[in-house]
Structures are given as C-alpha cells and as structure tokens.
C-alpha cells in the first residue's frame, strides 16, 4: 500500500485482511511517529509481518527535500521509531530510483549500499531487515547477478557494523 497522508485510517484498511498469512508492505510518503506506532500496535495485536519502507535518503534524492517532521530531523525520528517499535521493519532503500535515473548495474549496487551504510551510521538500533526495492531490466542473467552481488555486499557492510541482518529483496 502506498500511503501519502497521515490521516489514513490504517486499522480500517487492514481490518479484513488475513494478516497472519500475508506480508504487508507500506510505502509511506511521510514520516510520523504516531502513525508508525499505530502500525506497530496492529502488527503486535494480529501477529502480522509488516514493512513500513521508510526511506528519508531516497526521499531527499527523489524530491530534493527530507520528509517534513515536527523536529525537522528525519534521523532522530527514525532512531526513536527504531528503538520503540519491535514488531515492524522500518527502513527501506529504493534502488529503483537510481536505475530510473540512468545508473548502470554497478552504480545501482554502489549507491544502494552507500545508502545502507549511511543508515547504519545514523540509526543506532536496526534490528529488522532492511528492504531493498530494486528495479530489474531486460538482461535476465545480469540482473540475477546484480541481486546476488547486492545481497553478498550488503552482508559484508552489515558485518562491519556488527549486524547479522540480511537484506530483504521483495521480487
């Protein structure tokens, strides 16, 4: 689900879905502690697997501006959310942004990994997988190699920060 407005009633949106059987992905067009806490409460109550896909760096790269928050600091907000939400995954990296901007496969991997590196630097508590949204082109075997390389290199970067997280690649 893509949600652009904080006023969306997420409980009503999810009430008739079999949340214990499906994985839910939200792409939020804003950064709100209260909204994400509601999603976390739903995930806990219904034993759901939910990914919020928050990507402030991707927002900056795409729009030229950070998410608007009350304190005007996206990383402080993400740090607070990461330390208080235990039932959902928060962080996402939009690698498709770089492919659509004309990057080749090596550049896409490099930019996505530098993106992840910055999140590891700025967010103190990352305990859930990071979602990588990756665009694929028509060169089938090279795209498979790109995904394998991304997974392998991400594990190397995560190991440097003493994380044993795997990247999550929804394909």
Question: Where do the PLM segments sit?
Answer:
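Charged, flexible cofactor/metal-binding loops and thiol motifs
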Residues: 143-158, 171
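Short glycine/threonine-rich loop-to-helix capping motif typified by GTGT followed
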Residues: 104-109, 138-149
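Conserved helix-loop functional segments at active or binding sites
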Residues: 121-126, 156-164
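Self-splicing inteins and homing endonuclease
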Residues: 165-171
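Catalytic alpha/beta active-site cores
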Residues: 1-135, 170
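Histidine-centered divalent-metal-coordination microenvironment in nucleic-acid enzymes
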Residues: 133, 154, 165
């Amino acid at each position: 689900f893509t949600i652009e407005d904080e006023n969306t009633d997420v409980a009503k949106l999810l009430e008739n879905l079999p949340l214990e059987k499906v994985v839910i992905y939200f792409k939020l067009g804003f950064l709100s502690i209260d909204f994400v806490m509601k999603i976390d409460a739903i995930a806990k109550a219904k034993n759901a697997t939910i990914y919020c896909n928050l990507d402030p760096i991707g927002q900056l790269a795409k729009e030229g501006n950070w998410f608007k928050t009350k304190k005007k600091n996206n990383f402080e907000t993400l740090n607070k959310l990461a330390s208080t939400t235990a039932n959902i995954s928060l962080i996402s990296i939009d690698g498709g942004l770089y492919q659509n901007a004309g990057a080749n496969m090596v550049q896409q991997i490099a930019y996505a990994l530098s993106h992840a590196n910055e999140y590891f630097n700025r967010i103190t508590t990352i305990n859930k997988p990071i979602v990588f949204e990756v665009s694929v082109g028509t060169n089938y075997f090279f795209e498979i190699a790109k995904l394998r390389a991304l997974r392998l290199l991400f594990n190397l970067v995560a190991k440097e920060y003493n994380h044993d997280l795997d990247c999550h690649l929804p394909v």
